[in-house]
């Protein structure tokens, strides 16, 4: 097949090793390797993550290229997550992408991991035009943005302490659940009473678009200590109450962000919600209901595209390719890379 317009996307920002080949019409192949080694530690161990990327990334690239039935010479560019993320993990992806680009004489595109989350919905929803509101809720980030165009964003608010994904992971660890914590807490919450424990809703009634989750996390810790040895029902109720609290915090902040977005540009009527936490079904329902009541369309990528993946990196690469945004082989991965200067 012709490889004109094909792009290779490489994602190694944290603990998922992911590679995809796609063009503007379809995903030709996608390979993901999740690192189970971290579960016993209750979180990601940077050294283990980097070593696993180094061991398996080249294998996934070969499988993805074979699955797409093309060679490196057929690619239009190589897109690679270059930040933000764990620098040791990022280096593995960037170095292999540089090697492929150099040997195949192809341009390289440095992809911002947050922009990849923000833009992937445009691959699924062809009618999603700029500008739109974005809520990124992931393991390392929690922020509202207005997406004006590829590479052009305005930040409306962010977490002033912990990210939402980190909070889910830490609550799961306190309760002796597995990693990643989000799916574990969500599963337990289905069997719990969401109103048993009145956890604090930080900033809920205040103006602005910032978040705070550290107080909620502390309240969960105190509740666990107060309850002593937890039976299954108490554990389920803590998970349900925590998740309910998170939903209410998000809804209150979303209302403020939508008002701020409308004030900035009255044409904005859609909000993309992405990042790993956006895969949570309860939160998706709460956010969708809130958005509908406020006259917005809440747009969620499929759940498999909310968590880290190579498809979103490849798509962000295509968006930048159309803009002529290329990087040099001297690009350096960045642990911190805000979308808004």
Curated annotation (Swiss-Prot):
It comes from Anaplasma marginale (strain St. Maries). Substrate binds at residues 136-140, 169, 182, 280. This is tRNA N6-adenosine threonylcarbamoyltransferase. One of its GO terms (cellular component) is cytoplasm. One of its GO terms (molecular function) is iron ion binding. It comes from the Bacteria. It is an enzyme of class 2 (transferase). Required for the formation of a threonylcarbamoyl group on adenosine at position 37 (t(6)A37) in tRNAs that read codons beginning with adenine. Is involved in the transfer of the threonylcarbamoyl moiety of threonylcarbamoyl-AMP (TC-AMP) to the N6 group of A37, together with TsaE and TsaB. TsaD likely plays a direct catalytic role in this reaction. It catalyses: L-threonylcarbamoyladenylate + adenosine(37) in tRNA = N(6)-L-threonylcarbamoyladenosine(37) in tRNA + AMP + H(+). The gene is tsaD. It is found in: Cytoplasm. The keyword Iron applies. Its EC number is 2.3.1.234. Keywords: Acyltransferase, Cytoplasm, Iron, Metal-binding, Transferase, tRNA processing. Belongs to the KAE1 / TsaD family. GO terms for biological process: tRNA threonylcarbamoyladenosine modification. The keyword Transferase applies. Fe cation binds at residues 113, 117, 308. Pfam families: TsaD (PF00814). InterPro entries: ATPase_NBD (IPR043129), Gcp-like_dom (IPR000905), KAE1/TsaD (IPR017861), TsaD (IPR022450). Its cofactor is Fe(2+). Binds 1 Fe(2+) ion per subunit.
